[in-house]
Amino acid sequence: MIRVAINGYGRIGRSILRALYESGKRQQIQIVAINELAKPEAIIHLTQYDTTHGRFQPRVKLVDGQMQIGDDTIKIFHEPDPAKLPWRELDIDIVYEATGAILDRQSCEAHIHAGAKQVLISHPSSADVDGTIVYGVNHDLLRAEHTVVSNASCTTNCIVPVIDVLDKHFGVKSGAITTIHSAMNDQQVIDAYHDDLRRTRAAGQSIIPVDTKLARGIERILPHMKDKFEAISVRVPTINVTAIDLSVTLDKTVDIATVNQVLELAANGRFNGILGYTDEPLVSCDFNHDPRSSIVDGTQTRVSAGQLVKLLLWCDNEWGFANRMLDTSLAMIAAKQS
């Protein structure tokens, strides 16, 4: 049984906990502790009730300052300094670092000094970590000595499996990406101050361009794609599910049917459970609570002049990513035991 702690219990932290119980992985992973500065009553309430993902079916209670889910008791801490957390006493194997603020090796090593054996960051990190993993593509690179690992981003997890499939079958020369991302909690409900002037504006009233490092994230997973991709991102007034408009120029000449067939076969084969394929006339809310990293919308595939291919990909940017956090942590332990 893997003993884990969650540091930072926001959208991703809570999704990880709920995904653990819904995915059937509870027999492999035990959440021992949560560190979150919010009040315990709010922690319990937002675990039980969620606007995006609905009510959590197991009853969640606050008992003597701890979270209780069925027979499971999870300790709650409110410690701002990770180095002071009792990970050694709790025998923590992996910390899910989900604050969104601790992104480099030195900061993550506070968890190691506190007694945790490994750290998995739920965010793109600095380059000094032991590895950045997109599960299904490069998790085989994990090694026993790796202590600090990044799970990349939700959009990197969405797009990299597709690029990998296209490159292996047809060769990818270059690409351009537009991420159409649901609003996030770094935006404003009504106009308010922010360092990014576009993010001073009300999230529910505008399509808002934001900076993205997605192209660099692709390079970290697929180094041979260096300088081949560029990306832009806009935030839209929905609370969950993201679409990615991917355009790639291929080495080989293809048609729509060939591209879709290759992607559908990959979804049913090597990337089963990670990549999906649909030819139904669906909209973004149909992918809410989908545990896969990416779903190809085959109805939107286009080919121009035989080599320029445009794809539409969907992902639940919370739920899919939370499920990959679980998968990557299991892969980290497997590598450590090999």
UniProtKB/Swiss-Prot annotation:
Which catalytic reaction applies to this protein?
D-erythrose 4-phosphate + NAD(+) + H2O = 4-phospho-D-erythronate + NADH + 2 H(+)
Q: Does the keyword Cytoplasm apply?
A: yes
Biological process GO terms, please?
Answer: glucose metabolic process; pyridoxal phosphate biosynthetic process; pyridoxine biosynthetic process
Site (Activates thiol group during catalysis) at H181
Q: Which residues bind NAD(+)?
A: R11, I12, N317
What function is annotated for this protein?
Catalyzes the NAD-dependent conversion of D-erythrose 4-phosphate to 4-phosphoerythronate.
The record's PANTHER family line, in alphabetical order, gives: GLYCERALDEHYDE-3-PHOSPHATE DEHYDROGENASE 2
What protein am I looking at? Answer: D-erythrose-4-phosphate dehydrogenase
Could you tell me which species this protein originates from? Answer: Shewanella oneidensis (strain ATCC 700550 / JCM 31522 / CIP 106686 / LMG 19005 / NCIMB 14063 / MR-1)
Lineage per the UniProt record: Bacteria, Pseudomonadati, Pseudomonadota, Gammaproteobacteria, Alteromonadales
Q: What's the name of its gene?
A: epd
